[in-house]
Amino acid sequence: MKLINGLIFRRIALFCFVLSLSLSLYSRTGGNMSSAENKKSRYKIAACDWMILKRQKIGSFQLVRELNGDGVEVDMGGLGNRDSFDNKLRQVHFQKLFKEEAAKYNLEIPSIAMSGFYSQSFVKRANYKELTQDCIQTMIAMGAKIAFLPLGVECDLTKNPEIRSELVNRLKVVGNMAQEAGVVIGIETSLDAKGDIKLLKEINSPAIKIYYNFQNPLVAGRNLYKELKKLGKNRICQIHCTDTDDVLLQYNKRLNMNKVKETLDKMGWGGWLVVERSRDKNDPRNVKMNFGMNINYLKQIFQNETF
């Protein structure tokens, strides 16, 4: 009976999402009005291409347009044990193709992600400068101003404090590279706000900022809203505005998105909110339901859209 009820709920949720999206698109003129409005919006909503199962795939733009997003955070491609990212955007042909597709669907590319460093160690890679330069060149080619660099499992400073000196030195180096290129590298850490501020002071680079992820303080039991205020608007370059995979954002009882907006408004922060997770644990691969409903929920709160 529970299984049947779960299936019925997911079908109803998907139907409601499709209906709301259809009504939303009906009220627009080919998406052009939405694009013009969103360029003026203080907050814009994007999705990670690797989480919608479209890592460096041209189809990510059409899909995000269908999901009602404003942009796509494009990944550098897989890393694993390779010497370099599996990055097709080194080629001018693909750069042109991706930019044309983004323009076709009135979407932006706010950031380029090095998600490979979730599992790979930034402090153990001898060629970290080459990997970072590859990302910076891709950013310039695609018109993105922010890079996402997660300090993942092996660079977790709370569990591996002994790597701190080497990590800081490397971030100083890539910070200089980013500053020269006129871009920003956003780092995701497991530290609290006080720890992030201390780390940024040690790095001492205007081109290294915090790419904040709501999931980290929520999992650790910290006060998300107080942390945002403590960090302040100038230290946060971009936000992954989701929690772990369990329930959709609108059903998440430990994440009050209205309070998040109120906090960010008072801080004077504005920018891109990127949907990474918060998928329904019972149907995690249902991209259209999970990301569509989460994006629409965020648009209701941050862009005052109604569906």
Q: Each predicted region: which residue ranges?
A:
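Bacterial N-terminal signal peptides that target proteins for export
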Residues: 2-13
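Bacterial N-terminal signal peptides
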Residues: 13-24
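Active-site acidic/histidine proton-transfer and metal-coordination neighborhood
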Residues: 22, 101-105, 118-210, 218-219, ...
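Histidine-acidic metal/acid-base catalytic patches
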Residues: 28-46, 51-70, 105, 193-307
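Conserved beta-strand positions in the central sheet of alpha/beta enzyme cores
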Residues: 73, 111-113, 148, 186, ...
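Glycine-rich, proline-tolerant flexible connector loops at the mouths of alpha/beta enzymes
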Residues: 75-99, 151-159
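A short acidic, helix-capping loop that chelates divalent metal ions and anchors anionic groups
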Residues: 80-85, 118-122, 155-160, 219-221, ...
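Charged helix-capping and loop-helix junction motifs
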Residues: 88-95, 125-133, 161-171, 223-229, ...
